[in-house]
Amino acid sequence: MASLKSIIRQGKQTRSDLKKLRNTGKVPAVVYGYGTKNTSVKVDEVEFIKVIREVGRNGVIDLGVGSKSIKVMVSDYQFDPLKNQITHIDFLAINMTEERTVDVPVHLVGEAAGAKEGGVVEQPLFDLQVTATPENIPESIEVDITELEVNDSYSVSDIKVSGDFTIENDPEESVVTVVPPTDEPTEEEVEAMEGEAATEEPEVVGEEKEEDSEEENKDEE
């Protein structure tokens, strides 16, 4: 389990205060949840990124808050893509014996046999809902697709659960499938179609109207 230190933020802070804080490499955060009261803290951004890379998005962190150590998970965080900066973090204090339901990413492993024959691998499901105690939540779930042929699919029910967790998704839900290749026209076919379109004479609406008008005048005479 990875550890991360935090410093308690005292009093109310203005937007200007938070901007100065971020400019020093610190991220404002809040700790709340099981067995603790809401506490405003700050953590080092670089250290936080290191910890997340180590434990994963759903990993448990041993967060130092004052003189206490609290087991937390990252409930949410905000990121500013323009500044390439994490701007705020929500740490959720957790009960290690209580099950939680979270989204766990699906990672495809290998190259599908059907892809080698021109098939296209499509992945409609990128995350699975998993229920487990915090220490048993997997960082990711791997799906081996090497044996999938064209028109084969891999459903939730095909996943072999190797840990102490439950997948909550519909068993019939498709995780990945290999679809036949789409027949794209060759360069010669494209040129032929363009040539046909160019040789077609457009309909001249004005001429039709003039002819109709002449016929009407003859009828009146």
Swiss-Prot record:
Residues 184-221 have a biased composition (Acidic residues). Keywords: Ribonucleoprotein, Ribosomal protein, RNA-binding, rRNA-binding. InterPro entries: Rbsml_bL25/Gln-tRNA_synth_N (IPR020056), Ribosomal_bL25/Gln-tRNA_synth (IPR011035), Ribosomal_bL25_b-dom (IPR020057), Ribosomal_bL25_C (IPR037121), Ribosomal_bL25_long (IPR001021), Ribosomal_L25_dom (IPR029751), Ribosomal_uL5_bac-type (IPR020930). GO terms for cellular component: cytosolic large ribosomal subunit. Pfam families: Ribosomal_L25p (PF01386), Ribosomal_TL5_C (PF14693). GO terms for molecular function: 5S rRNA binding; structural constituent of ribosome. GO terms for biological process: translation. Residues 174-221 are annotated as: Disordered. It comes from the Bacteria. NCBIfam families: bL25_bact_ctc, PRK05618.2-4, PRK05618.2-5. Belongs to the bacterial ribosomal protein bL25 family. CTC subfamily. Part of the 50S ribosomal subunit; part of the 5S rRNA/L5/L18/L25 subcomplex. Contacts the 5S rRNA. Binds to the 5S rRNA independently of L5 and L18. This is one of the proteins that binds to the 5S RNA in the ribosome where it forms part of the central protuberance. This is Large ribosomal subunit protein bL25. It comes from Staphylococcus haemolyticus (strain JCSC1435). The gene is rplY.
